[in-house]
Amino acid sequence: MSKVYDWFEERLEIQAIADDITSKYVPPHVNIFYCIGGITFTCFLVQVATGFAMTFYYRPTVAEAFASVQYIMTDVNFGWLIRSIHRWSASMMVLMMVLHVFRVYLTGGFKRPRELTWVTGVIMAVCTVSFGVTGYSLPWDQVGYWAVKIVTGVPDAIPGVGGFIVELLRGGVGVGQATLTRFYSLHTFVLPLLTAVFMLMHFLMIRKQGISGPL
């Protein structure tokens, strides 16, 4: 085992990386509230894992979406548990995200030189809310359908481009299969990818600049 480790150590300098991670200075004013961002990240990982598991059985069509969700809940082994964890973790992620934003704002963590860290955080907050909006529609039940109809109809109030935005979101004039396909693609591919990219940027900047000092 030692020879294997030495082989990797010689090429990748694993010990230096481990020492850098474990020896990072933590300011004395840091308390439990500074862990909320990490909890949000953990919820995101749970969402990815449980969401990926459900993609094996979910069918993103207006004719089969609701039935496929019922199948996950009643026939798939532990399907009810996986979907329930996905739903609970989603609520927890939104709550932790809001608390994290408040903590950073109230402790002045958005000030110079951490403006870009704040910007990436705000973008991830928008992505988190978008996860909720797009995921809410996927069962394609009465609640999901009318929620989509209302949400996608909001931009219609924007002068000039409102109608175009509505048709872009819905994939047509009305809510239908094209809308569900768009929301499914956003929920399972576009938003996770965007969130992962900005999350990496967020972490790298925190790693570079460190945790902000006390007020």
From Swiss-Prot:
The N-terminus is blocked. Heme c binds at residues 35, 207, 211. One of its GO terms (cellular component) is chloroplast thylakoid membrane. One of its GO terms (biological process) is photosynthesis. InterPro entries: Cyt_b/b6_N (IPR005797), Cyt_B6_PetB (IPR023530), Cytb/b6-like_sf (IPR027387), Cytochrome_b_N_euk/bac (IPR048259), Di-haem_cyt_TM (IPR016174). Its cofactor is heme b; heme c. Heme b 2 binds at residues 83, 86, 187. Binds 2 heme b groups non-covalently with two histidine residues as axial ligands. Its main location: plastid. GO terms for molecular function: electron transporter, transferring electrons within cytochrome b6/f complex of photosystem II activity; metal ion binding; oxidoreductase activity. Heme b 1 binds at residues 37, 100, 103, 114, 202, 212. Keywords: Chloroplast, Electron transport, Heme, Iron, Membrane, Metal-binding, Photosynthesis, Plastid, Thylakoid, Transmembrane, Transmembrane helix, Transport. NCBIfam families: PRK03735.1. Component of the cytochrome b6-f complex, which mediates electron transfer between photosystem II (PSII) and photosystem I (PSI), cyclic electron flow around PSI, and state transitions. The 4 large subunits of the cytochrome b6-f complex are cytochrome b6, subunit IV (17 kDa polypeptide, PetD), cytochrome f and the Rieske protein, while the 4 small subunits are PetG, PetL, PetM and PetN. The complex functions as a dimer. Creation by mutagenesis of a Pro residue at position 204 (a codon that is known to be RNA edited to a Leu codon in tobacco and maize) leads to assembly defective mutants, indicating that the Leu-204 is essential for proper assembly of the cytochrome b6-f complex. This is probably due to lack of assembly of apocytochrome b6 with one of its heme groups. This is Cytochrome b6. It comes from Chlamydomonas reinhardtii (Chlamydomonas smithii).
